[in-house]
Swiss-Prot record:
Binds 2 magnesium ions per tetramer. GO terms for cellular component: phenylalanine-tRNA ligase complex. Its cofactor is Mg(2+). The gene is pheT. It catalyses: tRNA(Phe) + L-phenylalanine + ATP = L-phenylalanyl-tRNA(Phe) + AMP + diphosphate + H(+). Residues 39-156 form the tRNA-binding domain. It comes from Colwellia psychrerythraea (strain 34H / ATCC BAA-681). This is Phenylalanine--tRNA ligase beta subunit. It is found in: Cytoplasm.
Amino acid sequence: MKFSESWLREWVNPALSSDDLAHQITMAGLEVDGVDPVAGEFSGVVIGEVVECGPHPDADKLQVTKISLGDYSSTTVEKGELVTIVCGAKNCRLGLKVAVATVGAVLPGDFKIKKAKLRGVPSFGMLCSESEIGLADDSDGIMELASDAPLGQCVREYLDLNDVTIDVDLTANRGDCLGLKGLAREVGVLNSLEVSEPTITAVAPTIDDVITINIEANEACPRYLGRVIKGINPNATTPLWMVEKLRRCGTRSIDPVVDVTNYILLELGHPMHAFDLAKLDGGINVRFANKDEKLTLLDENEVTLKEGTLVIADENKALAMAGIFGGLESGVTNNTTDLFLESAFFAPLAILGKARQYGLHTDSSHRYERGIDPTLQHDAIERATELLLSIVGGQAGPVVEAKSDADIPQTKDVNLRRKMLDSRIGHHIEDAQVSEILTRLGFTVTTTGEGEAKVWQVIVPAYRFDIKIEVDLIEEVARIFGYNNIPNIAPKATLKMCEQKEANLSLSNLKQTLVNRDYQEAITYSFVDPKVQALLHPGQEVMTLPHPISSEMSVMRLSLWTGLLQSMVYNQNRQQGRIRLFETGLRFVPDESAENGVRQQNMIAGVISGLRVDEHWSMEKAATDFYDIKGDVEALLALTCDAQGYEFSKAEVDALHPGQTAQITKNGVFVGCVGTLHPELERKLGLNGRTLIFELLLSEVLVQKIPEATDISRFPANRRDLAIVVKEDVDAKNVLQLIEKVGGNYLIDLNLFDVYKGQGIDDGFKSLAIALVLQDTSKTLEEKDITDVIDRVVATLKTELNASLRD
């Protein structure tokens, strides 16, 4: 929407500069795209009158004129002097008021007018066209001014060219601002000024001629007004003031009738259309187009109308596409003397998208698609009638109206709560100011309650299609109050450190440990294949889904192994030889004593197969074994700072190899298990090579022992190695625990570094090589101190485990 600042100031005149006004409009949500002068920079151009006009003696296309400038005088023109100017414009004629650039004048582009001689005749200036002073891009001849234009007056002052155009890029919801009326209302509200609207009075009919109006599509056209105007002067011209206002809004002057309808569109934001009365057959009918009905538009293009297109028709034919484009056959021409003037409300949904179906986009369709004021039709037709009668003359008949009250948009009731307003804006605006803003916007406002319980009951006018709910009113109050006037307040919150128990071990630590050990995380479904699960957990009760995705995903998993092993098969089938996967998630174990009859436990599980490390020329190939995966599990348990508290013991698990399986406990509580998959299961599942697997309860490994700080001794440590011979069925773990128990405070580290069976060791026995590190924080240990500890350890091992020192 482009408009002239001076035209806007006729309605409302805030004490703001052009730039400040544009900024204010932008900050109110109506973005200004540009502010441009309405004419080029020029000086020394005044109004003159052609008092003599004759042919050039040596040029057929030139004329020699004498121009009167009235009482104007300058350094190059004396008062009352007739200025000789040679002109080539075809429309130059005797008595014409023109724009004269005298010698010394400067035109746009820094073009200076000098005395010249054209084909032997001196010329002391130039008669200017609109394009030469920057009023138009091109022109057919010199500029013709009104007959009452005062001689000698500066053209810039006469045409009020010290003006700018402001181009506003309106969003689709602000159709109410597609006219000076709506824009002025906004500026008035922003500056707390009254808006001076032009006085519109009903034009009394002087003839009785009417045309009947019938509306078949009431929902699409709830209101249609028409008026006959007869006896207009087809030779009348549009007054310069109107031409200039149209031009500054980006609209070209065509003829007085079209110019008036365009003027109403720009002034009130209401599209109108005029038909040549002589070309209408009978009454007006507002209907939808018939199948394959054709219409030649004003641009002389013929279109085949679609059945959903609303048209204005007479008894025999379609006359226009309603709200979009007029028809050529019924259009106003230079010979038109009688008019039928249309002012209608077309529903936005009836016009929306229709113009684009025909490759069109008009100022009229642009406004109807966004919605116009459904109460403005009478004002529009009366204003247009008044202007037409003053410009082209004629006699007006009575206004004929057809309407469907049930389909005309009604006012809306929306409540605005004080508590919600303050919450959304984050700033308290006084009650009186809120009421004033809403009232100035054209809303009818009543209030109830006080304080935070205050409610504004707002009746929204029908032309504000965008106001539907409470937040729409909040937006209106905020933008009119001014977003810049809302103080910047940093968010305030009561900050409290989240309690983080030092004993809590994060799951991410466990995951990262496995990733560091070359595992990759997998995510599998919680519902699994019942056949595979039955192989891993034979005889165990499962939860069956009532509506499974498929039969292969019909039960809930009893462990994470089912999904991981199927992922292992999937990857091995794609030539992946070395695979290391882990997963965390829930398992679902039926348990009548649990909530909802199911015990849901968070688990972490892993599976490995293939080589211990990737192939490399510097390393010997070695397949993974039980101790590889046990080492991975021990790395996880080490994160708890209490790895010694976990016990690995021989166990039997249905899915695992009977001789390569261990269960993990802590203080007698089951933690998990680790081992080699049963060879029979490897065969049934289609796995290649040895597969090793583990699963732990996260609840038992996500609690870590809080370490206790001890002094670092500055005295040397002493290492003593013991080779202990015990029966083969004695666990090394029991040996280490016993040594730790009797080693006393001097024992700071203990390590099993060798296990030997063979020559020199009796059958049924094994040799354990154990390193003991002894140190004191207060002194250097003497040999006697060390010997006492070693003797005590050896004696206890002999007594408790029947162990002996190896020879």
